[in-house]
Amino acid sequence: MQAKLIIGNKNYSSWSLRAWLLLREAGIEFEEHRICLDVEGCAEEIARFSPSGRVPVLLLDGQPIWDTLAIAETVAERWPEAKLWPQDPDARAHARSISAEMHAGFHALRDAMPMNCRAMGRKVALPDALTSDIDRVIAIWSDCHHRYGGSGYGDSGGWLFGEFSIADAMYAPVVLRFRTYGINLPDSACSYPERLLESSAMQHWLAAAESETEVIEREETGQ
């Protein structure tokens, strides 16, 4: 099966990161096609591949799958050997729940703290809605660490459910947001960001983001 992933700028496109990381960690070979966002002609180029006019979109033998969660579910279905959801039914239900929560929510966090891989030490105001989103993410990570971080579960790989899952792809951009804007984490929530950032796939993505020269001014938030 031929797989081609259409993504946006690696520095800014959080949904592109989710789909890309999922494929890389699953060990799936794919062609990458990057479209520079927010420039003349980008909408027309995206529309060549994506019925929704958004990235990412995954082409499997030419068939488009758009929306990151749809991509994730399709990949998990087509490549069951990748075990992209936890094998335990209760853990799998938990992983699906927090993935859907990230997919549908955290609007204050998205608006106030856009992903910007190159930026470090940025500061933004923390109104109540944003603080609530941050606290909820920390609670999710801490709960996963408590439930699944012990020896004997998922080989204790340091991911949210021991081994890499779709949930990790969904929360990866939040790790980068917290890094960019200097969000302090309690000890119970620190191990997951550390695990993600040290992975070879994330190191590859960050290096590519660093090498990009495009600047999207509306994404350059904070001082």
Regions found by a protein language model. Give the residues of each.
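Short, contiguous strand/loop micro-motifs
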Residues: 5-7, 33, 162, 179-180, ...
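Short flexible/disordered coil segments
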Residues: 95-101, 147-153, 215-223
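GST-like fold's C-terminal all-alpha helical module
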Residues: 102, 106-200
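Active-site-flanking alpha-helical
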Residues: 76, 174-175, 206
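Short capping/connector residues at structural and topological boundaries
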Residues: 89-90, 165, 207, 211
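Long hydrophobic alpha-helical segments typical of transmembrane helices together
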Residues: 188-223
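Basic/polar N-terminal segments that are highly enriched at the extreme N-terminus
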Residues: 1-3, 139, 219-223
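GST-like domain detector, emphasizing the conserved glutathione-binding G-site
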Residues: 1-127
